[in-house]
């Protein structure tokens, strides 16, 4: 099994990258892909860059060039579920765009023409992630993760997301674009991220302060999940 891992920022991939053995670096389209073995399992780790276009471009390059069997999206996210705090884990059962609006033509809010309203994560990957969470004794929530090309740190943006997606547990800037590409390639995916902030007016300050905490927690989860998928 070869496992693809995608993070947007240097801080979100560095801990995993440093553990890859026999590492080789591939530079493509402004992205970097690191291949090798993580605890004996073949991995391809992508640093995509921030935002939906960068994530979709990177995911496509990763899938075409490295042919992973599954994709894990890692990194940080803003918490929406009331029980979440910094360092907690969120696992997607679905991903949707929070900034797409073609409702004038009868589509659901967040749905693009020719696409499902949401992109479902793989049940086996979700189950494996939840098993890792239990083994690591981490606090976690599973549910809808929404994505858009905006960092949410104000009441207006937050209120709009809560209105359109009251069930959403977290918000970030890449996951749904990655899920969209995986859907088109028919490759199973799951989003496993750690909370760096709660999406409020102080979220930009919290993000800067706690990004390292979120990166450490999400990397710990991904390393455990890779081991679980490879060896059970």
Swiss-Prot record:
Record: active site: 12, 197
Enzyme class: hydrolase
Molecular function via GO: adenosylhomocysteine nucleosidase activity; identical protein binding; methylthioadenosine nucleosidase activity; protein homodimerization activity
Organism: Escherichia coli (strain K12)
pH dependence: Exhibits activity across a broad pH range. Enzyme activity is moderately improved under acidic conditions.
Pathway per the UniProt entry: Amino-acid biosynthesis; L-methionine biosynthesis via salvage pathway; S-methyl-5-thio-alpha-D-ribose 1-phosphate from S-methyl-5'-thioadenosine (hydrolase route): step 1/2
Gene name per UniProt: mtnN
EC number: 3.2.2.9
The protein's name in its UniProt record: 5'-methylthioadenosine/S-adenosylhomocysteine nucleosidase
Temperature dependence: Optimum temperature is 37-45 degrees Celsius. Rapidly inactivated after exposure for 10 minutes at 55 degrees Celsius.
């Amino acid at each position: 099994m070869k496992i693809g891992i995608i993070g947007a920022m240097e801080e979100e991939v560095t801990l995993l990258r440093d553990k890859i053995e026999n590492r080789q670096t591939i530079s493509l389209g402004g992205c970097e892909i690191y291949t090798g073995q993580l605890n004996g399992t073949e991995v391809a780790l992508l640093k995509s860059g921030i935002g939906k276009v960068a994530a979709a471009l990177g995911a496509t390059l990763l899938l075409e060039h490295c042919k992973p069997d599954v994709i894990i999206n890692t990194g940080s996210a803003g918490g929406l579920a009331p029980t979440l705090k910094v360092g907690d884990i969120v696992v997607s059962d679905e991903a949707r765009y929070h900034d797409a609006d073609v409702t004038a033509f009868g589509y659901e809010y967040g749905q693009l023409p020719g696409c499902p309203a949401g992109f479902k994560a793989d049940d086996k990957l979700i189950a494996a992630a939840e098993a890792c969470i239990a083994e690591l004794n981490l606090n976690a929530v599973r549910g809808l993760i929404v994505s858009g090309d905006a960092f949410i740190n104000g009441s207006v943006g937050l209120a709009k997301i809560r209105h359109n997606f009251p069930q959403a547990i977290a918000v970030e800037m890449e996951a749904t674009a990655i899920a969209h590409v995986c859907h088109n390639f028919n490759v199973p995916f799951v989003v496993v991220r750690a909370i760096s902030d709660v999406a409020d007016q102080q979220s930009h300050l919290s993000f800067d302060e706690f990004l390292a905490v979120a990166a450490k927690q999400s990397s710990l989860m991904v390393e455990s999940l890779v081991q679980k998928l490879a060896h059970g």
